[in-house]
C-alpha cells in the first residue's frame, strides 16, 4: 500500500487565441477565420472528447500568437469561453505560447492590460510554459503572482520528476502525453506512471492547428488522432478521478506532504495518516485476495488485485478475504 495523487488531467494548450491572425492560411485550409475555427469546429470536438472520458478541461489561453504583427486581440470573447468552460466544469489558465519568439516576461507584460479588461474577476492559477528554459522567469514575473502551478511539455530525460515544486509556492506538472502520438513505449511509460502515482497529464497543444505548417497539422487530422488516442488509452484508468489542473495541484501538494504508516496482521491492514485534513489516496495491491470491508474510508477496484483507497479519517482499517489454502498434488510413479 502506498500513496498516489489520483488525478487525470486533460490540458488544451494555446487555446483559444483572440486575435485575427494567419487569415490567408486559415482560409486556404479551413475556408474560415481563426475565430470561427476555434468556436465552431474545435470547441465542439473538445467537448465530445471530454464527455466521452468524463474529463475536466483546462484551456490555456493566450490573447494572441503573433506579437510582431498589427493584429490586436478582440474584445468581448473571453467571457464567452469562460462561460463555456464553467458549463463543462472546466477552467482556464494562461499560455506562454507564441509564434513571434516573444519572451515570457515581455509577453505577460503585454497581455496584462488585456486580461485586466477582459477577465478582471477571474483568478488564473495555472500557466502552460512552452519553453521550460523560462521557468526561472515565470517564478519571478510580477504578472504571474497568482500562478500556483506550471505545466510543461514531457520530460526528455529520466531524471526529471513528473510532479515537483518549481518554487516555494508553485508546483510543476510535466506532461505525460501529448494526445496525438502514442507509441508502444508511450503506453508502457503511461502505465508505469499510473501504477506509481495514479496520475496522468495529457497536454494537447493546439498551436499547430492555428499555425499549420504541414498537412498533418490540420485540425481534421489532429483531432482524429487525438480522439482515438485519448479515448482509447485512458480506458484502463477510469477508477482515478478526472481533474482540472488546479484541482490536480491541490492533490499534488497533499501527496508531497503526506506522512503515513501501514501494518498488516492476518487479514487486516491498518493505515495511519498523520494530520489528515482532507482526503488522501492510496493504491493497495492484494494479490489473489479481495478487499471486503473498510472503516475510515472507501475503496474502488482499479483492476484485479488492485484497489484505490480513499482515506477519509486518520485511521483506516481494511479487511481482506481469507487467503485460499494452497492445494498440493503428489504424483506417484
Question: For each predicted feature, which ranges?
Answer:
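Surface beta-strand/loop "capping" patches
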Residues: 242-287
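His/Asp/Glu-enriched short active-site or ligand-binding loop at hydrolase and phosphoryl-transfer sites
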Residues: 143-181
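Solvent-exposed beta-hairpin/edge-strand motifs
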Residues: 283-297
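Metal-dependent polysaccharide deacetylase catalytic core of the NodB/CE4 family, i.e.
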Residues: 16-20, 44-145, 158, 201, ...
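Catalytic grooves of carbohydrate-active enzymes
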Residues: 1-20, 45-50, 118, 129-134, ...
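The substrate-binding groove and active-site-proximal loops of carbohydrate-active enzymes
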Residues: 27-39, 61-72, 97-102, 130, ...
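C-terminal beta-strand-rich structural cap/linker in extracellular carbohydrate-active enzymes
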Residues: 303-333
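Small-residue (G/S/T/A) turn/hinge positions that recur once per unit in extracellular repeat modules
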Residues: 90, 257-260, 295-301
Amino acid at each position: 500500500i502506498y500513496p498516489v495523487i489520483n488525478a487525470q488531467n486533460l490540458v488544451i494548450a494555446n487555446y483559444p487565441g483572440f486575435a485575427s491572425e494567419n487569415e490567408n492560411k486559415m482560409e486556404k485550409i479551413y475556408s474560415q477565420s481563426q475565430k470561427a475555427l476555434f468556436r465552431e469546429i474545435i470547441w465542439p470536438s473538445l467537448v465530445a472528447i471530454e464527455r466521452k472520458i468524463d474529463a475536466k478541461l483546462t484551456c490555456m489561453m493566450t490573447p494572441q500568437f503573433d506579437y510582431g504583427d498589427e493584429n490586436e486581440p478582440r474584445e468581448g470573447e473571453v467571457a464567452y469561453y469562460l462561460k463555456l468552460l464553467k458549463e463543462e466544469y472546466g477552467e482556464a489558465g494562461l499560455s506562454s505560447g507564441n509564434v513571434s519568439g516573444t519572451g515570457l516576461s515581455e509577453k505577460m507584460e503585454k497581455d496584462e492590460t488585456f486580461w485586466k479588461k477582459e477577465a478582471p474577476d477571474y483568478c488564473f492559477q495555472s500557466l502552460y510554459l512552452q519553453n521550460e528554459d523560462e521557468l526561472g522567469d515565470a517564478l519571478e514575473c510580477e504578472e504571474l503572482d497568482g500562478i500556483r502551478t506550471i505545466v510543461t511539455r514531457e520530460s526528455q530525460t529520466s531524471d526529471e520528476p513528473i510532479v515537483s515544486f518549481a518554487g516555494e509556492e508553485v508546483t510543476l506538472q510535466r506532461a505525460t502525453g501529448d494526445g496525438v502520438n502514442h507509441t508502444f513505449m508511450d503506453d508502457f511509460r503511461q502505465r508505469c506512471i499510473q501504477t506509481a502515482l495514479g496520475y496522468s497529464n495529457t497536454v494537447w497543444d493546439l498551436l499547430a492547428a492555428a499555425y499549420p505548417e504541414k498537412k498533418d497539422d490540420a485540425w481534421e487530422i489532429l483531432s482524429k488522432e487525438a480522439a482515438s488516442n485519448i479515448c482509447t488509452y485512458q480506458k484502463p484508468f477510469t477508477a482515478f478521478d478526472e481533474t482540472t489542473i488546479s484541482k490536480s495541484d491541490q492533490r499534488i501538494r497533499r501527496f508531497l506532504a503526506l506522512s503515513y504508516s501501514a501494518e498488516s496482521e492476518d487479514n487486516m491492514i491498518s493505515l495511519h495518516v498523520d494530520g489528515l485534513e482532507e482526503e488522501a489516496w492510496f493504491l493497495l495491491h492484494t494479490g489473489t485476495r479481495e478487499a471486503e470491508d473498510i472503516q475510515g474510508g472507501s475503496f474502488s477496484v482499479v483492476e484485479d488485485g488492485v484497489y484505490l483507497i480513499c482515506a477519509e479519517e486518520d485511521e483506516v482499517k481494511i479487511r481482506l478475504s481469507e487467503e485460499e489454502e494452497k492445494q498440493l498434488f503428489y504424483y506417484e510413479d
